């Protein structure tokens, strides 16, 4: 949904003919994600490129194998995928003179659920001030509303499945954001108190959130 909203914002501002959508799948990318990414690009009328990361990932994995020998796979291997995607996208940006837009929402950036030199690579982030719940709201609003200044086609751009399916970075089997973070309505409510209202843990508890959730978000 983050990528879909960023693509939509770019198409609205610049025209879909000036937007390039790039899908960079791995073996952990679900079939539904492949279908949804292509659908968003087609709905917008934007260019769609398909760039698998397997060969690059295999090369990096083999290069590091002697150094990583005896150590269990962990978040390092997950971040390799994100950073490889960032490298490939920056190469496209460099070659074709196009600005790479990043897709990290305010919720992810606030709690560090993003990868430096990975999905944070790029020249501008259109959704940097949107919490994840606002991203979902924007997707629903965009499907139902159109304004004369919008350069994207009217109608449904983000398929309902994109908005409704559990969010996942898809960097390992069965991964969901909720494995590492509180549900986004909870996370965003706590972040709003701690960041936007400059509140405290006690303010979060007073608002109805658990101390455990508030402490986990703060740290």
Describe each region flagged by the PLM:
Residues 1-219:
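ATP/NTP-dependent adenylation/nucleotidyl-transfer catalytic domains that generate, transfer
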């Amino acid at each position: 949904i983050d990528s879909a909203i960023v693509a939509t914002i770019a198409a609205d501002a610049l025209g879909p003919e000036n937007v390039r959508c790039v899908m960079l799948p791995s073996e952990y990318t679900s079939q539904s994600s492949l279908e949804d990414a292509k659908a968003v690009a087609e709905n917008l009328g934007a260019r769609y490129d398909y760039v698998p990361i397997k060969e690059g990932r295999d090369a990096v994995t083999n290069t590091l194998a002697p150094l990583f020998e005896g150590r269990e796979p962990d978040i390092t291997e997950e971040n390799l995928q994100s950073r490889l995607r960032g490298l490939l996208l920056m190469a496209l940006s460099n070659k074709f003179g196009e600005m790479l837009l990043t897709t990290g929402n305010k919720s992810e950036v606030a709690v560090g659920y993003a990868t430096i030199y990975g999905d944070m690579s790029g020249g501008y982030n259109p959704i940097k001030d949107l919490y994840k719940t606002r991203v979902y709201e924007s997707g629903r609003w965009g499907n139902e509303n159109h304004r004369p200044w919008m350069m994207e086609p009217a109608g449904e751009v983000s398929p309902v499945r994109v908005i409704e399916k559990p969010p996942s970075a898809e960097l390992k089997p069965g991964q969901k954001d909720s494995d590492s973070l509180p549900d986004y309505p909870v996370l965003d409510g706590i972040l709003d108190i701690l960041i936007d209202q400059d509140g405290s843990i006690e303010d979060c508890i007073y608002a109805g959130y658990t101390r455990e959730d508030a402490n986990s978000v703060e740290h």
